[in-house]
């Protein structure tokens, strides 16, 4: 498999090198966390200073004896070298039960610069503060962006064709070694099955696997739609599946914990407040939708929405769904003091469709940038202060 340097993530690690924080690399299975760690090791090896690199991959058989936290702790201490910068990197740390006891003990000694990776529900953003005694810095790794997809395949022109393929096959890098779409979808389905069964069903001791799977697939089919545990429960009950609102809420949380779905909460633009009821959920990668639910209903509008949402998150934005009276804005993207309003569409060549997209933006009475991202196949242009940009072009900016 060809490897590419994911510069944005690598630069994050380089910026954090030497800081006292525990650096935690999180993300969905097979999104490239282990490869990122290897890239960082290569960077450390290129330094002129004396660096003692202690690299432990708990998936590898040679480290099988470290799957007990006392043994892991002793091994790390034994590898320490005086007079050098000692860097500890533990890949798939969750495979060692109670790993946090070993890592916390090492951290309190102040002798290692610590980096760890973990998949899915075992290293949650919300749990980092309670797992570790020290301050943590989280590096969130996503599947390949469109730019990374282009880099992997060495594509420097005919971007529209490449985008069409990216929409269908997504950004799971492990699938790229397979030459046919069917084989790529087989790979993605296997990753999905591992997440649901090995990670979530086993971790949370879910008894009704089919019920859990149904909710996941329902959410996949409804990316870009407003959902709540209550309306999901009612819909599934109509399909003769008895499931409570509380159970649905719990299952959605599990799927988010596994980085399979990301929530976009609603934000009231007039009242300047976040709304608790109804959210939208977007997949970590659109390939899961097609691999699991099939390609009969491509529904490009919502798929483009999903791609834009994930790209905004990659670029460091918090993403919300805007509400202005009875109108809806697809995304309110916030980053520190910056804010952007975005509408996403597959096709705005029809006048009524175009009006439906721009009218909510024109109703917003502030000076923040407003944008329509669509499949225009044209140069970027301005309409009444709203920037209209082709999605393929925007993803490459």
Feature map (PLM): residue ranges:
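Short glycine-rich substrate-engagement loop in P-loop NTPases that contacts/grips substrate
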Residues: 54-84
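Interdomain motor-coupling "hinge/lid" segment immediately C-terminal to the ATP-binding subdomain
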Residues: 119-121, 126-226
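Hydrophobic positions on the alpha1 helix immediately C-terminal to the Walker A/P-loop
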Residues: 36, 40
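Conserved lysine of the Walker
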Residues: 33
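Domain-level recognition of nuclease-like catalytic cores that cleave nucleotide substrates
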Residues: 377-397
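Accessory nucleic acid-recognition modules appended to NTPase machines
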Residues: 180-339
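Pre-Walker A adenine-sensing motif
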Residues: 4-18
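Hydrophobic anchor at the beta1->P-loop junction of P-loop NTPases
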Residues: 25
């Amino acid at each position: 498999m060809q490897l590419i340097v994911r510069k944005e993530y690598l630069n994050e690690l380089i910026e954090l090198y030497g800081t006292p924080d525990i650096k935690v690399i999180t993300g969905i299975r097979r999104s490239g966390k282990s490869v990122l760690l290897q890239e960082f090791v290569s960077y450390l090896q290129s330094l002129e200073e004396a660096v003692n690199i202690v690299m432990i991959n708990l998936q590898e058989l040679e480290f099988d004896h470290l799957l007990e936290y006392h043994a892991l702790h002793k091994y790390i201490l034994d590898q320490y070298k005086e007079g050098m910068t000692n860097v500890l990197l533990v890949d798939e740390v969750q495979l060692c039960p109670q790993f946090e006891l070993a890592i916390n003990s090492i951290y309190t000694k102040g002798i290692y610069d610590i980096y760890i990776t973990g998949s899915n529900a075992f290293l949650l953003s919300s749990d980092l503060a309670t797992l570790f005694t020290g301050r943590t810095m989280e590096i969130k790794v996503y599947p390949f962006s469109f730019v990374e997809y282009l880099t992997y395949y060495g594509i420097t022109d005919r971007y529209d064709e490449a985008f069409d393929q990216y929409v269908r096959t997504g950004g799971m890098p492990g699938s790229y070694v397979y030459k046919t779409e069917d084989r790529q979808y087989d790979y993605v389905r296997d990753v999905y099955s591992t997440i649901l069964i090995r990670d979530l069903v086993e971790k949370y001791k879910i008894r009704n696997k089919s019920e859990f799977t149904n909710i996941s697939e329902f959410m996949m089919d409804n990316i870009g739609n407003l959902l709540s545990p209550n309306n999901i429960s009612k819909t599934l009950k109509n399909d003769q599946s008895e499931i409570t609102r509380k159970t649905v809420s719990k299952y959605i949380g599990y799927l988010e914990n596994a980085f399979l779905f990301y929530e976009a909460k609603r934000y009231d633009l007039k009242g300047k407040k976040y709304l608790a009821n109804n959210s939208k959920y977007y997949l970590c990668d659109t390939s899961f939708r097609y691999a699991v639910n099939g390609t009969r209903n491509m529904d490009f509008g919502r798929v483009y929405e999903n791609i834009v949402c994930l790209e905004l998150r990659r670029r460091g934005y918090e993403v919300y769904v805007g509400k202005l009276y009875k109108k809806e804005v697809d995304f309110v993207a916030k980053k520190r003091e910056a804010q952007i309003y975005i509408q996403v569409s597959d096709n705005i060549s029809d006048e009524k469709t175009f009006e439906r997209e721009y009218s909510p933006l024109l109703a917003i009475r502030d000076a923040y940038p407003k944008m329509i991202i669509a499949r225009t196949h044209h140069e970027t242009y301005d309409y009444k202060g709203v920037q209209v940009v082709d999605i393929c072009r925007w993803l490459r900016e």
